[in-house]
Amino acid sequence: MGRGIGSKRRVEDDDGENMPGRKKKEEEEEEEDDDGEEEYEVDVVRDRIGSSRGSRLALFGSDLRLGRFRPRRRRVAPVDGDDGIFQDFVIDPDNKWYRLWTRFILVWAVYSSFFTPLEFGFFRGLPRNLFFLDIAGQIAFLIDIVLRFFVAYRDPDTYRMVHNPTSIALRYCKSSFIFDLLGCFPWDAIYKACGSKEEVRYLLWIRLTRAMKVTEFFRSMEKDIRINYLFTRIVKLIVVELYCTHTAACIFYYLATTLPESMEGYTWIGSLQLGDYSYSHFREIDLTKRYMTSLYFAIVTMATVGYGDIHAVNVREMIFIMIYVSFDMILGAYLIGNMTALIVKGSRTERFRDKMKEVIRYMNRNKLGKDIREQIKGHLRLQYESSYTEASVLQDIPVSIRAKISQTLYKPYIESIPLFKGCSAEFIQQIVIRLQEEFFLPGEVILEQGSAVDQLYFVCHGALEGVGIGEDGQEETILMLEPESSFGEIAVLCNIPQPFTVRVCELCRLLRLDKQSFTNILEIFFVDGRRILSNLSESSEYGSRIKQLESDITFHIGKQEAELTLRVNNAAFYGDMHQLKSLIRAGADPKNTDYDGRSPLHLAACKGFEDVVQFLLHEGVDIDLSDKFGNTPLLEAVKQGHDRVATLLFSKGAKLSLENAGSHLCTAVARGDTDFVRRALAYGGDPNARDYDHRAPLHIAAAEGLYLMAKLLVDAGASVFATDRWGTTPLDEGRRCGSRTMVQLLEAAKSGELSRYPERGEEVRDKMHPRRCSVFPHHPWDGGERRREGVVVWIPHTIEGLVSSAQEKLGLAGSGEGLRLLGEDGARVLDVDMVHDGQKLYLVVGGGGDDGGTEARQ
């Protein structure tokens, strides 16, 4: 594993600018009891971008390779040791020498904060010894100003350490540089040089901005869980009270010095008489006694004891005391409120400290590693400082209102995600109300390569990097994830291991969606699910890497289509009109078929749901679609006996489309299924369809003696002259059956058919008793020498056919033009109906005769 976080740091806010920490030695031993347990500092997680490279994901190096990329490198400033003082002339805030300097400046800040009101009230021109001390302090602050132009800081938005000198300088100039610089001016010398103008002395108060360093010190002590929180808070409150009274005492004395010596009696201290001691000519009294008297006046006034021994004399003093007492009421409320919070342990900081202690006990007990310790503490500190868990206050608000809040906060982000391009507003709304907001620090791994993923993430702010393992076993950066990006969707949608690691580069605000919730939404919004998979396959964000997953994506698209088709067919099968409409409204295509080629119309017709059939016809489902078994919706309705549905389909132009219709009808006749035969014939079935033996359904009915079936077939137009491959007609089958009624029915049908179609009698006769004739290739009057051997041929239906057949059998050459057939008397035969069975014919060319006829020659 690559280099992790270098050291632990104490949290400091530094005016919202940077948060320099304090590196402490980490305790590695587990404490035996709670009382003696080691308390750790709250740590600031370092800028860990580029850390944890190498072996963290080596176990998955053989899986899901995504190609080779050049890794992205980052420069990280040194953290510890003397070598880290300057890095490109930038000081790391965690350098131990710089931390010592900040403590040195803290001492001067305490001195300056207390001495500035004292100088303003009691001195008009510093004595020599205090003057040199003041100059030394200002020099120290000037050095600190110079150093702060080179101190790196942590960006509050990205949480990355900024080492750019220009950015550091601009940031400092925009913050406290002006006040720090003005505070270093020698205002005492300027006051004397300006002729002791009183207005100049007011500029001394600029130095009170240095009190912010003291405030930051107390704030860091409150967060340092090694120090008792109650003690820290009490010390802070005492210091606040003393500083307020100290400043008020200096102002009280200053008000008295603004009047000339001749009017000292009109001041609170000049008119003061304590016992036998008079404060007339108070400027000549010892400095300590004057300060203590002023401090006593300030404290008694703040406590509103009102002994009356010291009181205001002139109007200015009265006005200041009124302002001071009003301020004291606010200060008193602040002090009492803080003490109450200490007693009931209700402050946010104390809750954070308690939570941190519990976490540290857990980490010590389970002996967690250094890297995971840093991440846990960093997250706790982030929760405390950013207050991003404040959304928990909404838990008591109704779900509907929380949903509206989520839409207001997160909907713009989700709508801009490329993964959801083209999705419906209803789908986006369902996604938004199920989002959870999370923050991650730089360097943290959110998803690891090869792991099972059950969360989908969307980037609101910050930056992340996708890292894969190359063929050489080293980490390689695959892609950068910026705002409006998403990750985890490949593993979630394709149900495969995470193809690459996702690591935080900058402080990130992410929106998290649970896989189960996402799957549930996709089951309802089918079209949006297909759109998401399509967007994923077309995404350029992953470049060529997505090509390796195209088969998975295609498989899941097909799987989703098949599942959706089954759900539509299932709704049609059970006649669930509401569910069917909901599915189609959500984007399901009713024209799709299942694994057997069946559409919803097949199943609805099979079950006899007329309303479903009407709805599907309105949706444009193919009315004549055949499944893998050759069944159409109309045939399904006919088979199941749903006359109303069959009538509806037939009226819309549906066809029965019976494959091997003869076999179907013959089988139905054989089993006596009169209803099926009647419906099949009523909706377009052919009563004369033949099976593999050329038998018509009427053959089967006659052979089996099924009178009603035969009558049904005859009424539907079945021909009694149909012959099978053995030349048998239904009438022959009826005679063999021995059923008198059957024979009578078929004889009557024969008579009726002959009356309508007379030619059929001849056709049957020809088929039943075929005629033949003898054909000779010479003239009937030729002598014995010219006679030739003839052939016997069947008489076809046309004279041309007879000539052609005889020519072929006799082996005569030529096209057959000019050939004539003559009878025994030499007369030309023009029609096959003139030829009787067994007649002799002669095939000649031209008219023929003794004087001019010519016989056909081979």
Swiss-Prot record:
Transmembrane segments: 103-123, 131-151, 175-195, 202-222, 237-257, 317-337
Main location: membrane
Residue ranges of domain KHA in the record: 772-858
CDD domains listed in its UniProt record: CAP_ED
Sample GO molecular function, one term: voltage-gated potassium channel activity
Bilayer topology term: Multi-pass membrane protein
Positions of a nucleoside 3',5'-cyclic phosphate binding: 419-539
ANK repeat extents: 559-592, 596-625, 629-658, 660-689, 693-722, 726-756
Record topology, Cytoplasmic segments: 1-102, 152-174, 223-236, 338-858
InterPro entries for this protein: Ankyrin_rpt, Ankyrin_rpt-contain_sf, cNMP-bd_dom, cNMP-bd_dom_sf, Ion_trans_dom, K_chnl_volt-dep_EAG/ELK/ERG, KAT/AKT, KHA_dom
Extracellular side: 124-130, 196-201, 258-292, 313-316
Localization per Swiss-Prot or TrEMBL: Membrane
Domain of life, per lineage: Eukaryota
Any one of the GO CC terms: monoatomic ion channel complex
Keyword Membrane: yes
Compositional bias of kind Acidic residues: 27-41
Family, similarity comment: Belongs to the potassium channel family. Plant (TC 1.A.1.4) subfamily.
Biological function: Probable outward-rectifying potassium channel.
Stated name of the protein: Potassium channel KOR1
The organism of origin for this protein: Oryza sativa subsp. japonica (Rice)
